[in-house]
Amino acid sequence: MVQLRRTITTNKVFQAITSTNDKVAHFVVFMWESWLFVKMFAEDIVTFRKLQANKYVLGVLICSLCASVTSEFAQSVVSRGQRVFDVKDIICNFWGSLLGVGIAFYQDR
């Protein structure tokens, strides 16, 4: 696993792709991830133990807010400091995620 992580973060082709299209990649990946997250629930209301929540609200809370910010901190650890925290990445993550949840909502209606 460590070798795989080292290969991904030091691969020159991977670095060239992500450096030129970094913000687009963040936007598209979070849009896709959020869409998948919402679509994995068959019902609009998700029940966990005694708690109930709307799957679209969960998508916004978990994907748009939590994952958007957490991923920026995690990438610094995963890349062993080669990638740094960037507020613009969080903004792209957030808006991509919102669009993904919005597309899922539109498709379900």
Curated annotation (Swiss-Prot):
Entry's localization field: Membrane
Topology of this chain in the membrane: Single-pass membrane protein
UniProt keyword terms in alphabetical order: Membrane, Transmembrane, Transmembrane helix
GO terms for cellular component: endoplasmic reticulum; membrane
Pfam families from the UniProt entry: VanZ
InterPro entries for this protein: VanZ-like (IPR006976)
Domain of life: Eukaryota
Transmembrane domains' residue ranges: 90-107
Primary localization: membrane
Entry keyword Hydrolase: no
NCBIfam families: vanZ_1
Name the UniProt record assigns to this protein: Uncharacterized protein YJR112W-A
